[in-house]
Amino acid sequence: MVSRREAFTLIELLVVITILAILAALLFPVFAAARGKARSIKCTSNQKQLGLGCQMYLSDHDQCFPKRENVSDWQTRGGWPVELYAYARNAQVYRCPSDQTPYAPASLRGAAVESVSYLPNHQVVRDPPGRHEAEIDDMSSVLFLVDANTGGEVRNGDLNGVGTIGSVNERVEVNHHGGLNILFCDGHVKWLGYETAV
């Protein structure tokens, strides 16, 4: 004798759909947080690569940091990204993955970098020649690059003060869980909460 299979009732289907909706509502914030953490890790990696490029630049340029260009030369010569591009040749590392500003065209002597998400410390990246590392007392406490709202353009240093913790201005971008990633002159990258950074 063949048994007849019963179909699901409407109530059973509604219960299953409700359970799935509850699970989705519970898991969505977890996935969003994981995505944000992944972006923060990628940003840290980007800054670390720029830090390694800067260390190679220092070795090749008499221990002087990249120089900035005069204001009138920002768009035509590009400043610090052009200086580092020979050492960090992936244009993606110049953009934070959380930066949603549109790409702004900037001529960088033919370099592939069209947009930059990081702002350098003008006390380090300064008029030619760049600052000599011997002039910096504690490389591990002086900022080199921070997450910033540059509008996608190349900027050559708008950090206030001497570029240490607590001297960052309003251009910083709080892209990562209420804080930002900061590359220090010695090459290490650290996340800091907004209140600590400014």
Question: What would you call each of these model-derived segments?
Answer:
Residues V2-S45:
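Amphipathic alpha-helical segments typified by the pilin-like N-terminal helix
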